[in-house]
Amino acid sequence: DMTIRCPHDFDERFLLERLSDLYPSTWRFSVDSLVGASPEMLIAAACGTASSRVLAGTCKPGEGQALASSAKDLREHALASESVSSILERLCLDVRTQGPFLLSLPNVTHLATDVRARLGSAHLLDLVAALHPTAAVCGTPRDAAMHLIEELEDTERGRYSGPVGWVDTAGNGEFAIALRCGLASGTRLRLFAGAGIMPDSDPDAELTETEAKMRPLLDALGV
């Protein structure tokens, strides 16, 4: 994480407007002082169809072909996408996946997979509860990964990487994963970012990736 201080209170409306201008292909949000531009849809529901976008595996812009052939990143992505599709297969009908494909953003390029299914009797909020936390933000197996995070991670995530979204009375809605975000508190803005760790991860490369993922908020601030 990173904390930025300003002489005046942060205006979340300004940050949201800037993120919408700079990162229009993401899901932007501002909820109770948490503002961000997430590229990853945990789960959405509309007209009886559920959809999710899974991201895992990241590189600098322009290096997508190397990413698409990286055994390490493809394995990381497979673990993340399988964690989502396997849960939807238990709770939904006719689960279909499309990917992995390259998703290009101004600051990074991701491996992405879209997952779609028929809702059946499942409610959107049931899917949110079952999917969170995904392997992309927690690890797998989930219980073992959560235990290690509690033991080793010295940063309090708060609402970072949690579900953020909306739902209506008909059960339609969208819940993104709260990524590329910051928590505003008066003159302080705490930025969050992270990277998936695999056995063959390079710590320096993961740090560089994490710094790149902070660019949306930094760009919004003009830093």
Feature map (PLM): residue ranges:
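Short coil/turn segments at secondary-structure boundaries
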Residues: F29-S33, G99, Y160-S161
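Alpha/propeptide regions of enzymes that mature by internal proteolysis
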Residues: D1-I4, S85-S86
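Contiguous alpha-helical scaffold segments within structured protein domains
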Residues: S51-E151, G222
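Conserved hydrophobic core element of enzyme catalytic domains
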Residues: S38-E40, D114-V223
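An anion-binding catalytic pocket shared by soluble metabolic enzymes
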Residues: T3-L79, G171-G194
